[in-house]
């Protein structure tokens, strides 16, 4: 069991004491076959390697301070890239891909393609595309990420298990001016107490970035390379996890506050996605609720190979799938209720109490009201209420094929360890002998890559 001081992910990251790597920003101009790429801007010229001085900062970024970098442009990244580019006075966007071959595939593609469920298709190739690597390019312009300066607006939409590792790899280019937003499944690893420990070990006290999270409820399915279908429009929430603690220079307080809020405010103003800006405490609660939904929908649709709506076809308490859902929710409920009543999360609960319920610290009735809020949250995460929310959410995205199902069908690693695995790990951390057998069983079945019907599923889990 991971200790509170040294969870396994933190130990793994901190065991690497090397300086953060210097990364090169490859573009299609750096591909081995220059004839395969045509310049789309006059200032890029021919891609003859002899034309460029070594390490010359040839930048594709207009207004680099405001440029947005989307790291991991999968379904969520493409959704936000597509809609952010439609804003009035839209900021320039760079898509950061994770494989070299995606650069050449981008050149021959139609760009980011987003279809809605009515069949309307939007195509957009007005993005820069880069691959960030320690390997120096042999052809074309040689550029360091951000020309060796700091990244300001970073949107990380990789798989959950890769997100923090990606941010850690980029820390050479992150600092007090940087706003990093994670848009992933699961509960962020950066909540207290682990987040502050990580940040303190990786950044000087006056140079830490701000970290935020975006909880996305939209249903999105992959339909091809750089191509997604917005199957189930919904909403999203964005808020701070860790605010950089830099002490601004004299006379820069106001500017510092504006810079802190700029990127998340910009994201929340993106048209059509209904991304609401919330406080840290609200975000924590929302992430926990979304975790429960994902812990039910993702593995079950994957094992049954079905769309989301098929999980909720029956309300019969004797139905095999209903019995699995009921037990899964009872176990998740018990873990989260215990977490809410654990003092390790006092900072998040305080934020929630003071921003949502307007409690005033130090007031005479603060303690009594705080305890009452804790009781209300315990009820909010009771099994019957979670079940009602699960059914409502699942039926709203009934036509959606879950991200875990899409990963399994494509032969990719799933996020089961960041979803149901989080519930198992938290139960162990709390040390209250909580039953999480259903979640352990789901992890085993997903990692065995089995396909079941609901009767066999119930037999294996109950």
Curated annotation (Swiss-Prot):
Substrate binds at residues 294, 298, 403. The active site is at 290 (proton donor). Optimum temperature is 35 degrees Celsius. Optimum pH is 7.5. Disulfide bonds: none annotated. Disruption phenotype: Impairs the production of both beauvericin and bassianolide. It catalyses: (R)-2-hydroxy-3-methylbutanoate + NADP(+) = 3-methyl-2-oxobutanoate + NADPH + H(+). Environmental stimuli such as light and salt stress suppress activity through stimulation of calmodulin (CaM) that binds BEA2 and probably impairs its dimerization. A motif (Calmoduling-binding) lies at residues 167-184. Ketoisovalerate reductase; part of the gene cluster that mediates the biosynthesis of beauvericin (BEA), a non-ribosomal cyclic hexadepsipeptide that shows antibiotic, antifungal, insecticidal, and cancer cell antiproliferative and antihaptotactic activity. Ketoisovalerate reductase BEA2 catalyzes the NADPH-specific reduction of ketoisovaleric acid to hydroxyisovalerate, a precursor for beauvericin biosynthesis. This is Ketoisovalerate reductase.
């Amino acid at each position: 069991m991971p200790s509170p001081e040294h969870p396994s992910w933190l130990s793994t990251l901190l065991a690497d004491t090397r300086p953060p790597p210097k990364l090169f920003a490859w573009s299609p101009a750096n591909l081995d076959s220059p004839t395969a790429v045509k310049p789309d801007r006059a200032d890029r010229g021919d891609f003859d390697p002899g034309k460029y001085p070594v390490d010359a900062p040839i930048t594709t970024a207009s207004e680099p301070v405001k440029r947005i970098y989307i790291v991991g442009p999968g379904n969520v990244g493409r959704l936000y890239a597509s809609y952010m580019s439609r804003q009035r006075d839209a900021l320039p966007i760079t898509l950061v891909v994770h494989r070299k071959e995606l650069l050449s595939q981008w050149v021959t593609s139609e760009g980011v393609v987003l279809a809605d469920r009515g069949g309307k298709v939007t195509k957009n190739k007005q993005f820069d595309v880069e691959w960030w690597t320690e390997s120096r390019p042999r052809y074309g312009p040689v550029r360091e990420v951000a020309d060796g300066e700091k990244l300001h607006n970073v949107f990380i939409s990789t798989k959950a298990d890769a997100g923090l590792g990606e941010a850690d790899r980029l820390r050479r280019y992150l600092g007090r001016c940087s706003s990093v937003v994670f848009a992933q499944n699961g509960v962020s690893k950066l909540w207290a107490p682990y987040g502050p420990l990580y940040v303190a070990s990786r950044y000087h006290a006056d140079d830490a970035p701000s970290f935020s999270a975006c909880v996305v409820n939209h249903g999105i399915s992959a339909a091809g390379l750089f191509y997604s279908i917005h199957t189930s429009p919904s909403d999203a929430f964005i808020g701070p996890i860790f605010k950089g603690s830099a002490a601004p220079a004299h006379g820069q307080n106001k500017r510092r506050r504006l810079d802190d809020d700029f990127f998340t405010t910009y994201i929340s103003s993106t048209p059509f996605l209904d991304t609401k800006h919330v406080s840290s405490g609200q975000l924590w609660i929302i992430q926990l609720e979304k975790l429960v939904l994902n812990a039910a929908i993702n593995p079950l649709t994957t094992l049954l190979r079905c769309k989301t709506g098929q999980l909720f076809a029956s309300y019969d308490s004797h139905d095999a799938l209903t019995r699995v859902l009921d037990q899964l929710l009872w176990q998740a409920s018990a873990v989260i209720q215990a977490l809410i009543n654990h003092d390790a999360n006092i900072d998040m609960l305080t934020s929630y109490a003071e921003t949502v319920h307007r409690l005033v610290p130090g007031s005479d009735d603060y303690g009594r009201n705080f305890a009452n809020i804790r009781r209300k949250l315990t009820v909010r995460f009771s099994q019957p209420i979670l079940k009602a929310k699960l059914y409502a959410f699942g039926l709203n995205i009934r036509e959606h094929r879950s991200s875990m199902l899409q990963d399994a069908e494509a032969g990719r690693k799933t996020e089961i360890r960041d979803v149901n695995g989080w519930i198992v790990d938290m139960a162990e951390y709390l040390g209250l002998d909580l039953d999480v057998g259903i979640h352990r069983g789901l992890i085993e079945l997903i990692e065995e890559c089995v396909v079941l019907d609901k009767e066999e599923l119930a037999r294996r889990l109950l």
